[in-house]
């Protein structure tokens, strides 16, 4: 662990570069949530509700 910290200190990263990288990473997480997680969740809720209605109407016949 000590060698890794020395390597990072010796690389002389600026705070601006680290900040921009962190902002980009957070932006990627948000984009992934909007493009993948939200539509998948909506689809699963829709299918779940439809299946529940089908089972309810089938049981009453």
UniProtKB/Swiss-Prot annotation:
GO biological process: photosynthesis
Key words of the record: Membrane, Photosynthesis, Photosystem II, Thylakoid, Transmembrane, Transmembrane helix
Disulfide partners: none
Highest taxon in the source lineage: Bacteria
InterPro entries in the record: PSII_PsbX, PSII_PsbX_type_2_subfam
Keyword Thylakoid appears in the UniProt entry: yes
Protein topology in the membrane: Single-pass membrane protein
Subcellular location, record wording: Cellular thylakoid membrane
Segments crossing the lipid bilayer: 26-46
GO CC annotations on file: photosystem II; plasma membrane-derived thylakoid membrane
Keyword Coiled coil: no
Quaternary organization: PSII consists of a core antenna complex that captures photons, and an electron transfer chain that converts photonic excitation into a charge separation. PSII forms dimeric complexes.
UniProt record similarity statement: Belongs to the PsbX family. Type 2 subfamily.
Function comment: Involved in the binding and/or turnover of quinones at the Q(B) site of Photosystem II.
Name the UniProt record assigns to this protein: Photosystem II reaction center X protein
Organism: Prochlorococcus marinus (strain AS9601)
